[in-house]
Amino acid sequence: MTAIGSDVWLGIDLGTQGVRVVVAASDGSLLGAGSCPLTSHREGDRHEQHPEQWWRAVRTAIGRAHAAGADLRRVQGVAVDATSGTITMLDRSGLCVTPALMYDDGRAAAETDQVNAAGERQWAKAGYQRMQRSWALPKLRWLLNHYPHAAEDGWRVAHQNDAINSKLVGHEVPTDTSNALKTGADAAQVTWPERVLDALEIPRAMLPDLVLPGTVIGQVCAAAAAETGLTEGTAVVAGTTDGCAAQLGSGATAVGSWNSVMGTTLVLKGVTKDLVRDPHGVVYSHRSPSGHWLPGGASSVGAGLVAREFADADLDMLTREAGALLPTDLLRYPLVSPGERFPFIAPDARAFGSREPATRAESFAALLQGAAYVERLCFDYVDLLGAPTDGAIVLTGGATRNPLWNQLRADVLQRPVSLPRNTQPALGMAVLAASSRAPLDSVAAAMVQLDRTLEPRRSAKNPHEEGYLRLLDLLVQRGWLPGVVATHARERTAP
């Protein structure tokens, strides 16, 4: 039971397939949750959403959280996360006037070359070296090419959560450096790179002001209060991207700690005191509300293949059979889609296996093992960059529903891994909202409740070392994994 005097916070996760809302107390008690689906359109490199559905979905999800028992009158603050790199444009009255170009929309290939030529020094300073065509700044240049009257008509850029925040407060709002990172924001200085923008002919007036995540940017206005049930005057707090939100919701906020999300794909995010600079452009860093840095990367390996390859299988039985086969000498690199982004960049990478599986259970075992090996290589990579990896490792994502996979990941890493009781970005936004009143680490420690910690099974020699080293060799042979990375990973396997 939550104490009557306990503060309450509301987090909104604005995703691709839906909006999720969590109402949580300062002690971590979940008081209510709600969701509402979203639709989008994919065609080739194109991926769009109609932004007008976002506010309707947010209102519906908040209403469902209230119906589930949350007393919205007690909410002290609201924060919204969004998919990284998703942008739209608003007119002078705040209405969305273009489709939203989603986080993985890839139409801005030519504009990406233009952006990287103009901002080469700035992107190197930021640590990620080059922008990718799915990032927001190339997409903004693409929008301006297709809507040449935008600047004259007073249009301005809005990240996905900016559109919701402006609805909540009733006027234009600053954006957070996390969502603005892929639009070119200098997170260290909390400024826009105006020389780069000038070179790209992007008016500075088209971009919102910048603040760090966790900054109070306004209060719920009367109109939004009437539509949502929130109290007028409730604080609206600058949010972050969905990946950073998931990290906050995992409780991995202290320097050296890491959140490894094995969902459809693998995302690894950590906390460092200083900015991590990556000469290979694989890892990029967001700013934490605490002022620390949140380096990370997203692989194209993950649990997405489970649904694709084993949709008709009895997964419980398959898991039992796979457990008896581990470790297996069948090595798989289980890419969900072509191309790899982390722990190396290889656009031509394709999923592969070292041989044909003898049984379906062996193929399943090799999938679990392969993803765990890639996760280990990701940790080896960030260690090579100088990031501390000695803190807690928290596992989240759909793969954590498989107990065999959880234990396998601990065994491969030879590190304890923890699993939170509630794992969702919306909870991370409730944590972020609460951090506007108290230090982030203390807020996360109070609000994120761990379910259990798994210890790795110890032996004189890690039974997975031989397979891991063989996988490194296969990746080097294909020309995907740089030799310096493979050498460092091999050195870290030495006793």
Where are these regions (language model features)?
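N-terminal glycine/serine-rich phosphate-binding loop of ATP-dependent small-molecule kinases
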Residues: 1-99, 153, 225-226, 230-235, ...
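Active-site core segments that coordinate phosphate-bearing ligands/cofactors
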Residues: 2-4, 10-11, 116-130, 135-154, ...
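Residues at the N-termini of beta-strands
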Residues: 18, 74-77, 209, 354, ...
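Structural signal for short hydrophobic segments within the conserved structured cores
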Residues: 32-36, 208, 452
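Short beta-strand-loop/turn "lid" adjacent to the catalytic site in phosphate-handling enzymes
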Residues: 67-102, 128-134, 161, 165-186, ...
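Pocket-flanking alpha-helical
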Residues: 88, 110-114, 246-248
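Carbohydrate-associated surface elements
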Residues: 105
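A conserved helix-loop-beta module that forms one wall/lid of the active-site cleft
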Residues: 200-212
